[in-house]
Amino acid sequence: MAITDKLNAIGDAIRNKTGKTDKLTLDQMATEIGGITTDGDGLARSIVNKTITNYSDSEVTVVGGYAFFDQKKLTSVSVPSATSIGSYAFSGCSALTSVNVPKATTVSDRAFQQCTSLTRLDLPKVTTLNGYLVYGCSSLVELNAPEVTSGRGYAIAGSKIEHLSLPKLKTPGSSVFRDATSLRTVYMPKLDRLEAYLFYNATALETVTFPNVASANNQSMRGCTALAYVDLPINKSISTQVFYGCSSLNTLILRKSDDICTLANTNAFTSTPIANGEGYIYVPEALLESYKTATNWSTYANQFRAIEDYPEITGG
């Protein structure tokens, strides 16, 4: 039986179970492979045969929520015309190794959650990394999403992604890279602020340079225990507990030359080498004395150094 016939038959079975009378045609099934509500509590179940191992359909434009949910035998999917992928669409597909969704612009929350065999995911048209997108994808080492401009919480938590390039990411939500414990380096040149909890507990992150970040919000880098070097060229403010528990942080560079960066609370550096007198904050020489006496910064007066005096560290 062809896959479309199977889908149609399953649609008929679900319709019989729910008491609905509207006919689901093959064309409709091909257009929207989606989750069907089976009871009043909003739970949905996959409508795809549990024995399927490969799926390819160039006609599909929408992959609905839960469409392939928990398909343990599914190894490859190709839906080259799909522009939208619903929540949990491939969640739990533990054998999935190949995904082809070149036109998808929207991929909803948890779409690839717990796809534990997936090593690479290409989302060339997606603009938002939605919540828990690849949560628990314990083999995933590469994510290609060059058009992403925003994100939501825990998008890559539980993956093995070490290097992440998001050249257009500008305004992420809070906690987007929280618990991304394998992440070592990031390239995000357009990022304009560090939202609350943005890199919270990204324990492998080593160095960061954010040329366009103007503010570092509450606990945005907290618990980044491998983080040793932070360069914030135009940053204007550092909120509470931003670097709390960054136990390797020995270099912070604040290059903004027209005014000092405000510090909301001294706890921004609690449990760091800077707080322990072993790390340093590099600022423009013209602002050095102002930083030493500024509110909250005065606590770390002995840790300030002039950028110009340490070109080997700061690049001058």
Predicted features along the sequence, with ranges:
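Short acidic DE-rich linear segments
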Residues: 1, 315-316
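Surface-exposed receptor/substrate recognition regions of extracellular proteins
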Residues: 1-62, 277
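Short, surface-exposed acidic
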Residues: 20-28, 297-306
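Structural signature of tandem-repeat unit edges
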Residues: 47-62, 71-84, 94-106, 116-128, ...
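Consensus positions within tandem repeat domains that build extended binding/scaffold surfaces
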Residues: 64-67, 86-91, 108-113, 130-135, ...
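Short, aromatic/basic amphipathic alpha-helical patches
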Residues: 265-271, 289-302
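Short, low-complexity, Pro/Ser/Thr/Gly-rich segments in the mature regions of secreted, periplasmic
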Residues: 309-315
